[in-house]
Amino acid sequence: MFIALVPTTGWWDQHVWRQKEVHSFLATDERIVRPAADGGEVAVINLAGELFMNTGMSPFRIVDRLVDEAEALADAIVVDLHAEATSEKVAMGHYLDGRVTAVLGTHTHVQTSDARVLPGGTAYMTDVGMTGPLESVIGVRTDIIVKRFLTELPAQFEVADGPVRLDAALITAEGGRATGIEAFKVLL
C-alpha cells in the first residue's frame, strides 16, 4: 500500500494559472500537477473535460495514449478529470474501469456522495470537492457572486475569508487496482 498527496490545480485558463504572481513558482516546482503530468510510482493524468469547458478537445481522444504511457512508469494511475459535466465524468470512470487505479472528478467545488470502487477495480468519485473558504460561493466572496447574478455583469472574483475546508478522497489500492475509496472533509 502507498499514500500519495496529489494537489491539482485545474485547467490552464482557470484558478491558479491566472495568477501572474505564482507563474515563476509554477515553472520551477516539480510537485505541482499540470495537465497531462505524471510522476514517480504514482502517475497522475490531469485531463480537462470538453462539455461546457471550451477546451476544444475531448479527453477521450487522448486518454488511451496517456494511460498506456503511465502504465510503463507507475504502479498506480490516478486520473483527475477537471470537468463541468457529471455525465462526462461518469462515462470516463466506466471507460477506464480496470485500467487505472482511480478516476476523480474536479472543478465543481462541491464534493459528491458517490465514492465507490467500480467493478473492474477503479476507484471513482464524480467530484472530490475543493480546498477553500467554507462560507463562500465555491471559494469566492458571496457578495460578489450575488451581485453578479443580480446585475448580470462581470465581476472580479476575490477569495472569501474565514475557515477553510479541505475536501479529499482516501484511496487504498493493491497491484494498481483500488480496494477502497472514502470521501472526507476537514475544517481547518
Residues covered by each model-derived region:
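Acidic, metal/ion-coordinating pockets
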Residues: 1-188
